[in-house]
UniProtKB/Swiss-Prot annotation:
<dbReference type="GO" id="GO:0046872">
    <property type="term" value="F:metal ion binding"/>
</dbReference>
<keyword id="KW-0223">Dioxygenase</keyword>
<comment type="subunit">
    <text>Homotetramer.</text>
</comment>
<dbReference type="InterPro" id="IPR037217">
    <property type="entry name" value="Trp/Indoleamine_2_3_dOase-like"/>
</dbReference>
<dbReference type="GO" id="GO:0020037">
    <property type="term" value="F:heme binding"/>
</dbReference>
<dbReference type="GO" id="GO:0019442">
    <property type="term" value="P:L-tryptophan catabolic process to acetyl-CoA"/>
</dbReference>
<protein>
    <recommendedName>
        <fullName>Tryptophan 2,3-dioxygenase</fullName>
        <ecNumber>1.13.11.11</ecNumber>
    </recommendedName>
</protein>
<keyword id="KW-0408">Iron</keyword>
<comment type="similarity">
    <text>Belongs to the tryptophan 2,3-dioxygenase family.</text>
</comment>
<feature type="binding site" description="axial binding residue">
    <location>
        <position position="237"/>
    </location>
    <ligand>
        <name>heme</name>
    </ligand>
</feature>
<dbReference type="InterPro" id="IPR004981">
    <property type="entry name" value="Trp_2_3_dOase"/>
</dbReference>
<feature type="binding site">
    <location>
        <position position="114"/>
    </location>
    <ligand>
        <name>substrate</name>
    </ligand>
</feature>
<keyword id="KW-0349">Heme</keyword>
<comment type="function">
    <text>Heme-dependent dioxygenase that catalyzes the oxidative cleavage of the L-tryptophan (L-Trp) pyrrole ring and converts L-tryptophan to N-formyl-L-kynurenine. Catalyzes the oxidative cleavage of the indole moiety.</text>
</comment>
<feature type="binding site">
    <location>
        <position position="110"/>
    </location>
    <ligand>
        <name>substrate</name>
    </ligand>
</feature>
<comment type="pathway">
    <text>Amino-acid degradation; L-tryptophan degradation via kynurenine pathway; L-kynurenine from L-tryptophan: step 1/2.</text>
</comment>
<feature type="binding site">
    <location>
        <begin position="48"/>
        <end position="52"/>
    </location>
    <ligand>
        <name>substrate</name>
    </ligand>
</feature>
Length: 279
């Protein structure tokens, strides 16, 4: 065994980057790692910032996959769509794990910098709102917090003006089963998707004959899987907030834990959950 330190360059690894793109160059790490600006001298504020910044990065990827999945469905590329939906589920699994890190912050730790946050709040995350809009939970009232950023407001408004991903799924369902979409209920673009018996009847037909309708069955289960992880993320959000601030009002003026608990009752794909009791 040699006593000298291993030199990867001797095995052909490139060690100098004055003339080439490095890892840091490709990822723009100089800019990325310079975006954590604490407003206080509290030690745990850095954790709080990085927790939310990394969550936003994962949500950016989730949106990238969801938009591509919607396009793939419209083009009949179901295999590609399934891969994208599976990835979104894994993204929310990753986001769920991140709460474990934030839970190491105690209420006493949080109070040391909470005032520095002002009225900023996670419920103002436009990417989270866009994910909900894409999946079908559409509340036009939630546009208001983004009026001060015209391009963001326009992005969210544009999503509200088009069918959600679940609307496209149901269009595919009716087209496959009926051969047309004449009986497909018109989607409400400006309201959360509500349970519809006509849609549920079609899904029951799928679940009653999965061999014939395997692609639709697999699609439905991919959506249930996605919402399962999404619900867990919401639940972990509630328990983390309750653990850290109790039942105080949120920094954004919401009722805090009570507001988050209300969100737990929201179902993105209600027909796919309700039909389970009818099988």
């Amino acid at each position: 065994m040699s006593d000298s330190a291993y030199n990867p360059g001797q095995d052909g690894a490139k060690m100098g980057f004055a003339d080439a793109m490095s890892y840091g160059d490709y990822l723009h790490l100089d800019a990325l790692l310079d975006q954590q600006h604490c407003k206080s001298d509290a030690h745990d504020e850095m954790l709080f910032i990085i927790q939310h910044q990394t969550s936003e990065l994962w949500m950016k990827l989730a949106l990238h996959e969801l938009q591509a999945a919607r396009e793939a469905l419209q083009q009949g590329q179901t295999a590609e769509m399934f891969k994208m939906l599976a990835r979104v589920s894994r993204i929310f699994e990753q986001l769920n794990s991140a709460w474990d890190v934030l839970r190491t912050m105690t209420p006493a730790d949080y109070t040391r910098f909470r005032e520095a946050l002002g009225p900023s709040s996670g419920f103002q995350s436009y990417q989270y709102r866009l994910i909900e809009y894409v999946l079908g939970n559409r509340n036009p009232n939630m546009l208001r917090p983004h009026e001060h950023v015209p391009e963001v407001h326009a992005l969210l408004s544009a999503e509200l003006a088009r069918p959600s991903f679940y609307d496209e799924v149901n269009r595919y369902l009716f087209q496959t089963l009926d051969g047309h979409t004449e009986n497909l209920p018109a989607p409400r673009l400006d309201a959360p998707h509500a349970l519809d018996e006509t849609i549920q009847e079609r899904w029951l037909k799928v679940y009653g004959d999965i061999d014939t309708y395997w692609t639709l069955y697999e699609l439905a289960e991919k959506l249930v899987d996605l919402e399962d992880y999404f619900r867990r993320w919401r639940f972990n959000h509630v328990t983390t907030v309750e653990r850290v601030i109790g039942f105080k009002r949120g920094t954004g003026g919401t009722s805090g834990v009570q507001y988050l608990r209300r969100m737990l009752s929201v179902e993105l794909f209600p027909e796919l959950w309700t039909l389970r009791g009818d099988l």
